[in-house]
Amino acid sequence: MSKANLTHHFLIAAPELSDPRFEQALIYICRHDKHGALGLMVNRPLEQARVGKLLEDLDIEVTDAQVMEDLALEGGPMYPEVGFVLHTGQPEWASSFAISENVCITTSQDILKRIAAGQGVGHYQLCLGHASWGKKQLDRELANGDWLVCPADLNLLFDTPFEERWQMAADKIGVNFDYLSSDIGHA
């Protein structure tokens, strides 16, 4: 089983993954330690969930027109009513922590107000819900061949169109799913 810390890596759902909630999912791992793992799907836009509308529903005035068009993402099946802001920069917000040198996750409303005004957040994605794994659960799924691992990069995380991210992550590690055996991970 994996002993590596996969924080700031992508999990690429293998085509044979049996859980339909994660079909062709690309998950950014925010935390991976001895207690388990937490990640956010970063390739599933919620077509009916515009960031601006969600902010207005929280009584936050939106003055940045682009925010009205930005799509929120389905972060995962756990707690879909909870928002997580994945963003570049430093953990300077009320409820924020650094994932890597230049990627943070924040759950407090202070960042939402700055996003609404188009002020100083840099790249961001608002994810509703998250994916999580218990102690050693992710290691078992990796050993089972459910996921492939790819180092994270900011272009793929924030700039690549959502519908291209899963394949682009696979391409980045040299995987062609057309030739991938369903027996991956087994000797």
Curated annotation (Swiss-Prot):
Taxonomy, top ranks, is: Bacteria, Pseudomonadati, Pseudomonadota, Gammaproteobacteria, Moraxellales
Report which superkingdom the organism of origin falls in.
Bacteria
Which source organism? Psychrobacter cryohalolentis (strain ATCC BAA-1226 / DSM 17306 / VKM B-2378 / K5)
Please give an example of a GO cellular component term from this record: cytosol
Q: What family classification does the UniProt entry report for this protein?
A: Belongs to the UPF0301 (AlgH) family.
Q: Provide the protein name.
A: UPF0301 protein Pcryo_0062
- Output the InterPro entries linked to this UniProt entry: AlgH-like
Q: Which Pfam families match?
A: DUF179
Look up the coiled coil feature and give its residue ranges.
none
Matching entries from SUPFAM superfamilies are given as:
VC0467-like
